[in-house]
């Protein structure tokens, strides 16, 4: 079966749908400047993690506007300053592409999640082998890492999630229309940590 091809608006709707699923104590890693606040259920107890000082300042302002009590944490996903089993869910949109070490970040996510906790990740991912898009990703990634907050356009994020022990409940592989080098492969992953 062919991977569905969608446009940016359809992707935005799916992102909001996936983020809206989380409940309870929620950690958002790489929370940026708060783009996901409108998608969260109003009853979540939100905590954000953002290593970039400029984004974190904007995030703090927006968190107050959305009535979230927590102050965003200055930390990277590879070293989350929270106790073991302290959150019910972890959300990351366009963040696993830019962490320094995916395996270390996902190990930290597992550590802070309660057993059976939920993970929701949305990210662009590695294109299929022997495609123009895969070639473009290989050429562009060294540049993107320097100018796009460490972004790797060529990561196999789904495999990293599986290797970290997460089980997909709703996993969608999509392609988003893009020019000039063709559609961007995307992954939407709603899953669980071990121990449910």
PLM-predicted stretches and their roles:
Residues 103-115:
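A short glycine-rich, Lys/Arg-flanked "PGG" loop and its adjoining helix->strand segment in the class I
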Residues 45, 116-118:
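Short glycine-centered segments of the SAM/dcSAM-binding site in methyltransferase folds
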Residues 186-196:
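C-terminal lobe and adjacent flexible extensions of AdoMet/dcAdoMet transferase-like proteins
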Residues 88-101:
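A short SAM/SAH-binding and catalytic strip from SAM-dependent methyltransferases
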Residues 78-90:
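A short acidic, Gly/Pro-enriched loop at the edge of an enzyme's catalytic core
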Residues 25-28, 32-79:
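Class I SAM-dependent methyltransferase SAM/SAH-binding core
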Residues 5-25, 35-39:
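Conserved alpha-helix/loop element of class I SAM-dependent methyltransferases that forms part
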Residues 2-9, 122-183:
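C-terminal alpha-helical "lid/dimerization" subdomain adjacent to the S-adenosyl-L-methionine
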């Amino acid at each position: 079966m062919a991977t569905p091809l969608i446009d940016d608006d359809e992707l935005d709707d799916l992102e909001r749908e996936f983020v809206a699923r989380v409940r309870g104590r929620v950690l958002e890693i790489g929370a940026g400047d708060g783009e996901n606040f409108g998608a969260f259920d109003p009853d979540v107890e939100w905590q954000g993690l953002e290593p970039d000082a400029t984004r974190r300042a904007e995030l703090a302002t927006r968190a107050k506007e959305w009535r979230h009590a927590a102050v965003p944490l200055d930390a990277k996903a590879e070293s989350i300053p929270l106790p073991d089993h302290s959150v019910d869910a972890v959300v990351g949109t366009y963040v696993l592409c830019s962490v320094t070490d995916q395996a270390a970040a996902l190990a930290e996510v597992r550590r802070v999640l309660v057993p059976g906790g939920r993970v929701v990740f949305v990210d662009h991912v590695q294109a299929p082998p022997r495609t123009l898009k895969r070639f473009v990703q290989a050429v562009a990634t060294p540049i993107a890492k320097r100018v796009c907050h460490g972004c790797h356009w060529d990561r196999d994020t789904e495999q990293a999630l599986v290797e970290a022990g997460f089980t997909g409940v709703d996993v969608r592989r999509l392609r988003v229309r893009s020019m000039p080098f063709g559609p961007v492969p995307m992954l939407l992953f709603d899953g669980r940590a071990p121990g449910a």
